[in-house]
From Swiss-Prot:
Record keywords: ATP synthesis, Cell inner membrane, Cell membrane, CF(0), Hydrogen ion transport, Ion transport, Membrane, Transmembrane, Transmembrane helix, Transport
Gene3D superfamilies, per the entry: F1F0 ATP synthase subunit B, membrane domain
Subcellular location per the Swiss-Prot or TrEMBL entry: Cell inner membrane
Subunit structure: F-type ATPases have 2 components, F(1) - the catalytic core - and F(0) - the membrane proton channel. F(1) has five subunits: alpha(3), beta(3), gamma(1), delta(1), epsilon(1). F(0) has three main subunits: a(1), b(2) and c(10-14). The alpha and beta chains form an alternating ring which encloses part of the gamma chain. F(1) is attached to F(0) by a central stalk formed by the gamma and epsilon chains, while a peripheral stalk is formed by the delta and b chains.
The protein's name: ATP synthase subunit b
Gene Ontology cellular component list: plasma membrane; proton-transporting ATP synthase complex
Gene designation per UniProt: atpF
4Fe-4S keyword on record: no
A Pfam family annotated for this UniProt entry: ATP-synt_B
Length: 171
């Protein structure tokens, strides 16, 4: 089949030379052409199977390599998707941690503000109580010193009932 196509192709190429009217009787172009076609046919006969098997094996190698590359690409894409999913989860976890930390910081701040307020109120109450005690103590000492001075002085005389009445009215 292939040889027939070659012969027809060769004849089509030589047809313009035949139409020109040149005298090619003195040349051996036809014999050489037939020898060439025979050589190509014999070469094709012996090498066709090897050439086909070589091309087929190369085609199989290429398709096998293509399948391997596609499998690697698929694995890479799956790995990328997995990593992107893990990244999203990590971002969500980080946002959750930050929000929890902010809530906890607010709670701790409120707790310490309340504790500080209570401590200040207690300090104020304690200082007022201490001031009241000191005032009472100073009044008592003053009254005692005045009564002591009055008793020691002979100008005024008090009995116990008068002292009790004065103390009740002043304290």
């Amino acid at each position: 089949m292939f040889v027939v196509k070659m012969v027809l192709g060769f004849l089509i190429l030589l047809s313009p030379l035949c139409a020109t009217g040149l005298d090619i009787s003195q040349t051996d172009i036809i014999e050489r052409s037939l020898n060439f076609l025979l050589f190509v046919g014999i070469l094709w006969y012996f090498l066709a199977k090897r050439l086909r098997s070589f091309l087929h094996s190369k085609s199989l190698e290429i398709s096998k390599r293509l399948e391997e590359i596609q499998a690697q690409l698929k694995v890479s894409k799956e790995h990328k998707k997995k990593l992107l999913k893990e990244l999203e989860q990590a971002k969500e976890k980080a946002e959750l941690i930050i929000s929890d930390a902010n809530k906890e910081a607010y709670t701790i701040t409120q707790k310490y503000e309340l504790q500080t307020k209570m401590d200040v109120e207690n300090l104020i109450k304690n200082s007022k109580a201490l001031m009241d005690l000191e005032v009472k103590k100073i009044k008592r000492e003053l009254v005692e010193s005045v009564f002591k001075d009055l008793r020691e002085s002979k100008k005024v005389s008090f009995n116990a009932q008068d002292c009790v009445n004065i103390l009740k009215q002043r304290l």
